[in-house]
């Protein structure tokens, strides 16, 4: 990333995760990801309502879900069926958890709360291929608001978002270690109502106008809670 040494760098350059697998490598599932372990392969499973998980996994619980932690502090995700999930974290290292779609580019509705004490994002998060792009649409954040190379603004769903582009060099991704672009839409003011809509096409079109071309939507898209060296909680329900 271009902003070496900044807090933005640090949240994306987290300590080595469990079993030596990166967060991006773990989350690349598109519904078929397997987590390599010393004893074999942990395949995505089907969870049940009110199931609390603390180990890295993907699966379905009414909707696709993904949970990854680097093992720092105490982090859990509770799967409540349908599009609902909650998280609790205390003195975490880095984690990301969310529900959504194994492949996706559709509109998203959500409600609930995101309550970080320190650094974290409440965001729509996903990847495209060819070109490989990691993208964020950030509606809420904790002590740090992400930035990058400024590309303009887009108005959508009752708010104005600043558009940023950053680059990751030789970094872990859903396609292995590669250099790739990150695209960001970051709301100028946080969503405080507890509910929101993200019309993804508005952001994708604005990125294209700024010369930020997307690829194919072969990979997952989740409404995510991410924390970095912080504590907090969230309770989110996602729908299309």
From Swiss-Prot:
One of its GO terms (cellular component) is extracellular region. It holds the Pfam family Glyco_hydro_11. It is found in: Secreted. It catalyses: Endohydrolysis of (1->4)-beta-D-xylosidic linkages in xylans. InterPro entries: ConA-like_dom_sf, GH11/12, GH11_AS_1, GH11_AS_2, GH11_dom, Glyco_hydro_11, TAT_signal, TAT_signal_bac_arc. Residues 1-49 form the signal peptide. Its EC number is 3.2.1.8. Keywords: Carbohydrate metabolism, Glycosidase, Hydrolase, Polysaccharide degradation, Secreted, Signal, Xylan degradation. Residues 1-21 are annotated as: Disordered. Exported by the Tat system. The position of the signal peptide cleavage has been experimentally proven. The active site is at residues 134, 226. Its main location: secreted. Changing residue 23 to K: 4-fold reduction of XlnC production and severe impairment of precursor processing. 7-fold reduction of XlnC production and severe impairment of precursor processing. One of its GO terms (molecular function) is endo-1,4-beta-xylanase activity. Pathway: Glycan degradation; xylan degradation. It comes from the Bacteria. One of its GO terms (biological process) is xylan catabolic process. Residues 51-239 form the GH11 domain. Contributes to hydrolyze hemicellulose, the major component of plant cell-walls. Belongs to the glycosyl hydrolase 11 (cellulase G) family. Replacement of the wild-type signal peptide with a Sec-dependent signal peptide resulted in a mature product that was translocated but that lacked enzymatic activity. The lack of activity was probably due to an incorrect folding. No xylanase activity and no XlnC protein were detected in the supernatant of a tatC mutant. This is Endo-1,4-beta-xylanase C. The gene is xlnC.
């Amino acid at each position: 990333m271009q902003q070496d040494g900044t807090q933005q760098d640090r949240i994306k350059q987290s300590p080595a995760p469990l079993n030596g697998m990166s967060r991006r490598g773990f989350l690349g599932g598109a519904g078929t990801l397997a987590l390599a372990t010393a004893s074999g392969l942990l395949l995505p499973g089907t969870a049940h309502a009110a199931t609390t998980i603390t180990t890295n996994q993907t699966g379905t619980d009414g909707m696709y879900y993904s949970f990854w932690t680097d093992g720092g502090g105490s982090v859990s995700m509770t799967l409540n069926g349908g599009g609902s999930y909650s998280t609790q974290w205390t003195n975490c290292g880095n984690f990301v958890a969310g529900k959504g779609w194994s492949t996706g580019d559709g509109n998203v509705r959500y409600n609930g709360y995101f309550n970080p004490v320190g650094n974290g994002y409440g965001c729509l998060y996903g990847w495209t291929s060819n070109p490989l792009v990691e993208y964020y649409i950030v509606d809420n954040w904790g002590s740090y608001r992400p930035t990058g190379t400024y590309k303009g603004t887009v108005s959508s769903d009752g708010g104005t978002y600043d558009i940023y582009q950053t680059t990751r060099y030789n970094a872990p991704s859903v396609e292995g270690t590669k250099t790739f672009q990150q695209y960001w839409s970051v709301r100028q003011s946080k969503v405080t109502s507890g509910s929101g809509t993200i019309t993804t096409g508005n952001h994708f079109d604005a990125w294209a106008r700024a010369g930020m071309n997307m690829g194919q939507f072969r990979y997952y898209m989740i409404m995510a809670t991410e924390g970095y060296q912080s504590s907090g909680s969230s309770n989110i329900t996602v729908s299309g």
